[in-house]
Amino acid sequence: MAKANTAVRVRKKVRKSVSEGIVHVHASFNNTIITITDRQGNALSWATSGGAGFKGSRKSTPFAAQVAAEHAGKVAQEYGVKNLEVRIKGPGPGRESAVRALNSLGFKITSISDVTPVPHNGCRPPKKRRI
């Protein structure tokens, strides 16, 4: 009986080399989402406070945002990213700590901009909390 040819070619996924990227930090009151993209907006890596192992009210802490930024930054370093442009959106507590974590990983931060959407008297905000 003839042997079947079992040799299977496995191609390695080729990682594109990107020198500079954009970090989108979405800091809400409940969570922090960090996405690192290339110049065209294609996502290279992303991380969240909840995905970093924090649950409940601990997701909304600055330390959780720092850990999430380190996760996303380490994956982006595998793509060869050196320079980052930071765009921060939202009022959450993880805004500055995410940027500091990326800076401590050795990235050169070229610019930091706040892109929080501000309504020109749009929708009515929710009522004030009474505790």
Swiss-Prot record:
Q: Which InterPro entries match?
A: Ribosomal_uS11, Ribosomal_uS11_bac-type, Ribosomal_uS11_CS, Ribosomal_uS11_sf
Q: Does the keyword RNA-binding apply?
A: yes
Cellular component per GO?
Answer: ribonucleoprotein complex; ribosome
Record keywords, A-Z: Ribonucleoprotein, Ribosomal protein, RNA-binding, rRNA-binding
Whichever gene encodes this chain, its name is rpsK
Superkingdom is Bacteria
Keyword Calcium carried by entry = no
Q: Name one GO molecular function term.
A: rRNA binding
Q: What does this protein do?
A: Located on the platform of the 30S subunit, it bridges several disparate RNA helices of the 16S rRNA. Forms part of the Shine-Dalgarno cleft in the 70S ribosome.
Q: Which family does it belong to?
A: Belongs to the universal ribosomal protein uS11 family.
Task: Show the SUPFAM superfamilies listed in the entry.
Answer: Translational machinery components (SSF53137)
The family database entries (PANTHER family) matched by this protein are listed as: 40S RIBOSOMAL PROTEIN S14/30S RIBOSOMAL PROTEIN S11
Among the record's GO biological process terms, what is one?
translation
Subunit architecture: Part of the 30S ribosomal subunit. Interacts with proteins S7 and S18. Binds to IF-3.
Descriptive protein name: Small ribosomal subunit protein uS11
Q: What Gene3D superfamilies is this protein classified in?
A: Ribosomal protein S11
Which PROSITE patterns does this UniProt record tie to the protein? RIBOSOMAL_S11
